[in-house]
Amino acid sequence: GSMGKGITYLKKGNWRTNFRLENCQLSNHPKDYVWDFIDVTNDFSFLKQLMALGENITIEKEIDSFLIDDRKFDLRVYVCFGKLHYIFPRSNDPDAVIMNITQGAIGQNTEFILGDLDDQISEISKMAIASVETLKLNFAGVDILIEKGTKKPYILELNAFPGFTKPERFNISEAVIYEICSQKWD
């Protein structure tokens, strides 16, 4: 994934970006983490420079996130060989733009979502497994956001090389190795 880099958030009265532009060129940060957001509200010159880069730009509509304990969150769902192995909730402040752990989000235990999303777990599981199978992958992390009001799950992205959780939460490496060893290979 992009690790939360290269994002511009535009909402009426609230424009933020972690892009840096120098002389109409995209400037890379010296490190791959902590790409801080800066306020660019009503800075039309910034938008013009961004559009002039000629790069592919993805524009997405914001989905208002369901909150648990007054925290915005998403779910990293680990799928291996057609089975859901772990749901890893990642939470951040309600006004945060991203849920990436390297950018300030907090990894939660699965208990964080229990009670609030019990009715959605089956649909989340089916969506995650189907998306991984559609791309013909054996292993992936599927990022899912739950919409405020409807509690409808949305797939945000699929990561063929997802970061792993800490083993004390769930040892995803062990689960992947077990699944590989359990396969019947021709």
Regions found by a protein language model. Give the residues of each.
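Short glycine-enriched loops at secondary-structure junctions
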Residues: 90-94, 145, 150
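C-terminal active-site "lid" helix and adjoining low-complexity regulatory extension at the edge
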Residues: 100-139, 146-186
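Phosphate-binding site of ATP-dependent enzymes
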Residues: 1-100
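Short, surface-exposed charged micro-motifs
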Residues: 76, 143-145
